[in-house]
Amino acid sequence: MLTDGSYFHLHLVSDSTGETLITVSRAVAAQYANVSPVEHVYPLVRSQKQLDRVLQEIEESPGIVLFTLLESELVNRLEAKCQQINSPSLSIIGPVMQLFEAYLGASTTGRVGAQHTLNAEYFKRIDALNYSMMHDDGQHVEGLEEADVVLVGVSRTSKTPTSIYLANRGIRTANVPLVAGIPIPHQLETLKKPLVVSLHASPDRLIQVRQNRLLSLGAGAGNDSYIDRQAVTDEVLLARKLSAKYGWSLLDVTRRSIEETAAAIMKLLADRQRQRMSE
């Protein structure tokens, strides 16, 4: 058993980019805050020679081995070696593929990296990313009607990172800051197509994040309106009033990660689309 503060070797072996392995393993490793994985990522492992080099490194630094390999000979060799050196191994996609095969009554194509084919979904993500970068932080508001989602909120409510995250899911996302004393763009008042989501956070949380931001910029944490409690509270209240006035969806991001915020927005978007289809 590992003790607090220790580390372990985590070997990620893939015949493609390794993105699936990295995402899954980091999500699981995050649940064990007292130990740290040392990641060894081996992408594009598609031959016996390439696998030999991987097996040598695993033998030199034994640990958990996760893999996404479709070639059965490579899988058998990897599993045999792991068993020999007592390193636990697991295919991340194997059980999922077996479930699909049992339900669909069809075997897989065995096509390596099929999920990375340049299909319509890929180009949809690229289009969404381009759109979101062009419409970040209130830029080009004349194009807001072309968005799937428009995020609004006061400073430091994670509008930009949430926009990029959603864009990576193929969702065209614009974001517009709500600033005290500055009227909102008139385009926001008449939007029909996009889902407008107003991101909110508690004044305490906003002050904390803004102070950290100022310190990172070397600006110090002076008592200006950016972090003044009353001023920040007024900003939050103004944002809520605007949301109520225009019927924007409210989402409290005080204790949400970017991923959780994006997931909540995607649910709102899906619910809205289902409602429109039923009308």
Curated annotation (Swiss-Prot):
Pfam families: Kinase-PPPase
Keyword Nucleotide-binding: yes
Binding locations of ADP: 153-160
The enzyme's E.C. designation: 2.7.11.32, 2.7.4.27
Swiss-Prot/TrEMBL keywords: Kinase, Nucleotide-binding, Serine/threonine-protein kinase, Transferase
Family in the record: Belongs to the pyruvate, phosphate/water dikinase regulatory protein family. PDRP subfamily.
UniProt name for this protein: Putative pyruvate, phosphate dikinase regulatory protein
A GO term, aspect molecular function: phosphotransferase activity, phosphate group as acceptor
Disulfide bonds, paired cysteine numbers: none
Broad enzyme group: transferase
